[in-house]
Amino acid sequence: MATKFPKFSQALAQDPTTRRIWYGIATAHDFESHDGMTEENLYQKIFSSHFGHIAIIFLWTSGNLFHVAWQGNFEQWVAQPMKIKPIAHAIWDPHFGQPAVKAFTKGGASYPVDITFSGVYHWWYTIGMRTNNDLYNGSLFLLILSAIMLFAGWLHLQPKFKPGLSWFKNNESRLNHHLSGLFGLSSLAWTGHLIHVAIPESRGQHVGWDNFTYTLPHPAGLQPFFTGNWSVYASDPDTSNHIFGTSQGAGTAILTFLGGFHPQSQSLWLTDMAHHHLAIAIVFIIAGHMYKTNWGIGHNIKDILDAHRPPSGRLGKGHKGLYATITNSLHMQLGLALASLGVITSLVAQHMYAMPPYAFMAKDFTTQAALYTHHQYIAGFLMVGAFAHGAIFFIRDYDPEENKNNVLFRMLDHKEAIISHLSWVSLFLGFHTLGLYIHNDTMIAFGTPEKQILIEPVFAQWIQASSGKALYGFNTLLSSSSSIATKAGSSVWLPGWLEAINSNKNSLFLAIGPGDFLVHHAIALGLHTTTLILVKGALDARGSKLMPDKKDFGYSFPCDGPGRGGTCDISAWDAFYLSVFWMLNTIGWVTFYWHWKHMTIWQGNVNQFNESSTYLMGWLRDYLWLNSSPLINGYNPYGMNNLSVWAWMFLFGHLVWATGFMFLISWRGYWQELIETLAWAHERTPLANLVRWKDKPVALSIVQARLVGLVHFSVGYILTYAAFVIASTSGKFG
């Protein structure tokens, strides 16, 4: 008899119902639970899958390069980056009528195309690419790299090339290699690319495979490096009237500390970025030589952790026991990695617009909006994933004996205090923020807008002023012309910073007022509530007063049978499930705020945001409703325009989102009855009953149906907003 799916679970493979298929898919990546899985095999499988993951990423980016080179307008865009819209790829669609063909033929193309809002053109241009040939070369290189990665993944599954368990758990060696090799050397290599290729290209000097071996990136060559006269590399930077991509106004400096932005491209100075990457390379290469391996010198991480014991003794044993706990728990490691990556992704969203690294991207408003929204949503999913794996760690990997009286033990011991404080903060923020908004709504509704409660964010304004913003008149630190910091700053470090922070050509430290104060606290409410749900889920994952034996039921269970009241919806998975709704809610507020404020700034109409953002009807009417007109009018019986595809996607996103509720509200019994009725009808219908099934159809479990509902809710929510952001922004700014 042929073995049935899933091969990794004998018990599931013998299940006579459709549960076999759905549970098989659900547990396909839960390697720990597979039949005959050993710890060593688990590590080897995960290690090999990393190579596959990297191969997919390289294949995807290779495809981007290839399609732009083949069907895009990169060379035309390079000639006029401010005037021409960058093309992602051609559209072939048999449904297109003549009006559609006409509407989507744009960006200088002679056929229907998709415009890209990803910023890749700006990135490729900034790093020195100028021709379609450059793009094809990059595409081919990544394709070869992708094939090598696939081979490496396969190779590391072969008996001779499978690393042993001790290799995976050798933390010091791994840290040294990752810090020095992965971060250090790759940063050094990137510095090399910027200095040898990107900076010369930005000054109108082409450097390619044909001439890079004998083209000096700096007229003085390596002499200043070996003689210690490093300041030569910083002297003669590009001037403020430098035309990007030409020699007009160009300097010779390669490593600078100018601060601020290139006046024409409104992006960070390339020479500043080269300096930044060189500094990071040096720091990480040094960091990668800190840990003790084959030679008896350097730090031992276990010793460091064990030494972290607060001297008063009131905080228990500190970090003692963490070394073994983290080393032996993949979920703990994944949780830490996801949390770090989540924070850095949100920082990327912030810095990509406040300090754009790519030439001319600051003037492509739709790209700015799309990238901010994209990175904030990704950050949200990474953060909730971190807590999910933190909870799985507590259920599957936490050893109370190993962690006696240390920081993990004490977190669990004090969980009531932690959870109740988060609850108190969430309640305080929620009631006060909503109270202020509703008061203001009522005052506007009764025709007395002057009675609104409007609070100036004075502390935030003071922080902006101390960073150099002169607008508020605080006259403190960098915003005071007589302070030591200002005097040092204007001559020694970052002379361009003060000009940039007080310029209205960028999004650095935007002026803030009462509307910002309110939405800031609404976002704080969302963050604290999401955190409350996630922290409670992880800290109660092993057990609670209501259900002390919870850990024995695993990560996701619906209830402990009908006979034990109150045990439904309290698994760690349910906490994750609830948190995703709050995470989406919060990031919705974050992106609404960012987008509306920027839309009004770009339109030269910032008063609209300042006046309408202090009450809820203002948000609904002047942001959502007002900006949805290109989506509501995207197509009609009389014709369409080039936003019609976004209008359709806006509609489709709502549909997907609404489908989620069908699974979230009606539970398993409803579906089971429906399935049995349909099966009965099928078996009695001529012709249809010739089609039989081997597996008895049964409804999804409660947990699975919730997942299906959650996925539809999330995908629909994000798709709807993505269409809204792109259509409303590109509809106004072309």
Swiss-Prot record:
The keyword Disulfide bond does not apply. It is a multi-pass membrane protein. Its main location: plastid. P700 is a chlorophyll a/chlorophyll a' dimer, A0 is one or more chlorophyll a, A1 is one or both phylloquinones and FX is a shared 4Fe-4S iron-sulfur center. It comes from the Eukaryota. It catalyses: reduced [plastocyanin] + hnu + oxidized [2Fe-2S]-[ferredoxin] = oxidized [plastocyanin] + reduced [2Fe-2S]-[ferredoxin]. It is found in: Plastid, Chloroplast thylakoid membrane. Gene3D superfamilies: Photosystem I PsaA/PsaB. Chlorophyll a B3 binds at M662, Y670. GO terms for cellular component: chloroplast thylakoid membrane; photosystem I. It holds the Pfam family PsaA_PsaB. This is Photosystem I P700 chlorophyll a apoprotein A2.
